[in-house]
């Protein structure tokens, strides 16, 4: 079903594109035009506020509506800086965490924004050329006075926005968690617990009665720091106009003059990128934040991630997720072939491939390049490497063939049970049954165990038999526990 509104990105920006039966369509239509009929807790229209659209629950599907359509704001991105501290490279086009700063910002804001107004000067053509094939609804507003400051850049956007709009900086990096909270705020979005910025360089704010009382980098007493993100309305230009004749118009002066309200988004990832060292710090922060919240085994949490995140941070701007998947696969396949020459060496390479296997996901999430296709290919290649490694060792030591068969079967079934659950129920089995996060037998744990036994095989080949036996035992036990958990669940 499509409820058409304004066009955005080739698709109506205010539309709902959902699969619903006609009964649900009727309920949705009734709710839009007769919201009082949906005032219960299970199917309700929330109170309208100036900063967030109401939500309605229709057969479990929350639909955001605003007078019959989704309410989206415009977003102004100030990108008129000279980029002098980054070797003349336009800051918005600097790649951080595998994604250009302005592209990251626009991707994360897209669900909330109808049009982007990008205020640029010297690098306007470069930014336009970069964005023209990205599918965004945007407008470049040019001016030739970047030396007048970011407050003047805001003034330049005056005739291109109305009502409420988002204002952000072209050299700031934000996480998705920050954006989702910030767009629901009002005025200055500030942070009382900044974890990723140099406080000495940050713009500090003194708050009184919930509004900006003082603002500046040199404040000795302050309550929070400015994140470079604002949710404003067009009344801000009345205050900006009072400063128009100044040689330089800092945005902070406009903020102080307007006594903007302050909304706190504390402790989330955000930072401004001014230097090459900032780029490196942002890479590390974005990759660390990209570690998936569930599904990792004990070895991944305690060992692998500590290494893989460092590797990912070093290469995130040079390698895409698919290339990283291929590299991990090739190392894994080579580890299997190395068994013909040295079992201990093969085990070490196998463990290294397991560490690298975490990098593609970290890079994909950090660079906002996640895809179902990439996850599918990665999963298939992992199964291939696991089978190849164990099969070659079983071939080299045929006396272990029977127990090796159970080890290979169990290894495949561990992955199959979790992937099949996700396919059938549409959610991660590790989120549903958290106890499975602590039962041994995940891929990272099996590979680490295999490495240990491969190293011990240098002392006695009898350890090869015990390797297969242990892998079979923990993997099949995990499969049985998983099945029981699903069967007894409601």
Swiss-Prot record:
InterPro entries: CDP-OH_P_trans (IPR000462), CDP-OH_PTrfase_TM_dom (IPR043130), CDP_ALCOHOL_P_TRANSF_CS (IPR048254), IPC_transferase/DIPP_synth (IPR053433), MobA-like_NTP_Trfase (IPR025877), Nucleotide-diphossugar_trans (IPR029044). Signal peptide: none annotated. Its EC number is 2.7.7.74, 2.7.8.34. It is found in: Membrane. Residues 72-290 are annotated as: MobA-like NTP transferase. It catalyses: 1D-myo-inositol 3-phosphate + CTP + H(+) = CDP-1L-myo-inositol + diphosphate; CDP-1L-myo-inositol + 1D-myo-inositol 3-phosphate = bis(1L-myo-inositol) 3,1'-phosphate 1-phosphate + CMP + H(+). It comes from the Archaea. One of its GO terms (cellular component) is membrane. Residues 291-490 are annotated as: CDP-alcohol phosphatidyltransferases. Mg(2+) binds at residue 180. Its cofactor is Mg(2+). The keyword Coiled coil does not apply. Optimum pH is between 6.5 and 7.5. CTP binds at residues 78-80, 91, 144, 180. GO terms for biological process: phospholipid biosynthetic process. PROSITE patterns: CDP_ALCOHOL_P_TRANSF (PS00379). It is a multi-pass membrane protein. The keyword Protein biosynthesis does not apply. The chain crosses the membrane at residues 329-349, 389-409, 447-467, 468-488. It holds the Pfam family CDP-OH_P_transf. One of its GO terms (molecular function) is phosphotransferase activity, for other substituted phosphate groups. Optimum temperature is between 90 and 95 degrees Celsius. The activity is undetectable at temperatures below 60 degrees Celsius. Its main location: membrane. Involved in biosynthesis of di-myo-inositol phosphate (DIP), a widespread organic solute in microorganisms adapted to hot environments. Catalyzes the condensation of CTP and L-myo-inositol-1-phosphate into CDP-L-myo-inositol, as well as the biosynthesis of di-myo-inositol-1,3'-phosphate-1'-phosphate (DIPP) from CDP-L-myo-inositol and L-myo-inositol-1-phosphate. The cytidylyltransferase is absolutely specific for CTP and L-myo-inositol-1-P. Forms a mixture of monomers and dimers in solution, with prevalence of the monomeric form. This is Bifunctional IPC transferase and DIPP synthase. It comes from Archaeoglobus fulgidus (strain ATCC 49558 / DSM 4304 / JCM 9628 / NBRC 100126 / VC-16).
């Amino acid at each position: 079903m499509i409820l058409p509104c304004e066009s955005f990105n080739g698709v109506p920006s205010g539309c709902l594109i959902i699969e619903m039966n006609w009964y649900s369509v009727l309920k949705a239509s009734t709710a839009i035009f007769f919201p009082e009929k949906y005032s219960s807790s299970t199917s309700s229209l929330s109170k309208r506020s100036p900063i967030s659209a109401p939500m309605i629950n229709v057969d479990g599907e929350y639909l955001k509506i605003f007078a019959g359509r989704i309410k989206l704001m415009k977003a102004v991105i100030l990108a008129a800086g000279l980029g002098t501290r980054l070797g003349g490279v336009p800051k918005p086009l600097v790649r951080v965490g595998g994604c250009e700063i302005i592209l990251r910002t626009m991707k994360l804001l897209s669900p909330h924004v109808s049009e982007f107004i990008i205020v640029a000067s010297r690098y306007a053509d470069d930014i336009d050329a970069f964005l023209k094939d990205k599918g965004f609804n945007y407008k470049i507003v040019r001016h030739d006075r970047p030396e007048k400051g970011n407050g003047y850049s805001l003034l330049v956007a005056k005739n291109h926005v109305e009502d409420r709009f988002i204002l952000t900086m072209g050299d700031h990096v934000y996480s998705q968690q920050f954006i989702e909270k910030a767009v629901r705020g009002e005025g200055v979005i500030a942070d009382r617990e900044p974890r990723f910025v140099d406080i000495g360089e940050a713009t500090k704010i003194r708050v009184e009665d919930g509004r900006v009382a003082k603002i500046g980098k040199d404040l000795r007493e302050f309550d929070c720091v400015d994140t470079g993100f604002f949710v404003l309305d067009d009344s801000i230009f009345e205050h900006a106009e009072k400063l128009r004749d100044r040689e330089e118009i800092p945005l902070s002066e406009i903020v102080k003059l307007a006594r903007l309200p302050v909304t706190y988004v504390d402790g989330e990832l955000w930072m401004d990128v001014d230097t090459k060292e900032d780029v490196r710090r942002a890479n590390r922060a974005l990759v660390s934040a990209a570690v998936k919240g569930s599904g990792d085994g004990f070895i991944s949490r305690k060992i692998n991630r500590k290494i893989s995140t460092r590797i990912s941070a070093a290469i995130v701007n040079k390698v895409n997720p698919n290339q990283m998947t291929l590299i991990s696969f090739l190392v894994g396949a080579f580890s299997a072939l190395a068994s013909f020459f040295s079992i201990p060496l093969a085990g070490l390479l196998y463990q290294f491939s397991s560490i690298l296997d975490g990098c593609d996901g970290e890079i994909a999430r950090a660079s906002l390049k996640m895809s179902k296709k990439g996850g599918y290919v990665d999963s298939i290649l992992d199964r291939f490497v696991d089978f190849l490694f164990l099969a070659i060792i079983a071939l080299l030591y045929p006396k272990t063939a029977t127990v090796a068969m159970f080890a290979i079967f169990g290894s495949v079934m561990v992955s199959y049970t979790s992937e099949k659950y996700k396919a059938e129920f549409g959610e991660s089995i590790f989120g549903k049954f958290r106890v499975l996060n602590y039962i041994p037998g995940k891929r990272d744990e099996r590979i680490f165990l295999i490495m240990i036994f491969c190293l011990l095989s240098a002392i006695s080949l009898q350890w090869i038999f015990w390797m297969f036996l242990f892998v079979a035992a923990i993997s099949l036990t995990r499969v049985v526990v998983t099945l029981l958990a699903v069967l007894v669940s409601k």
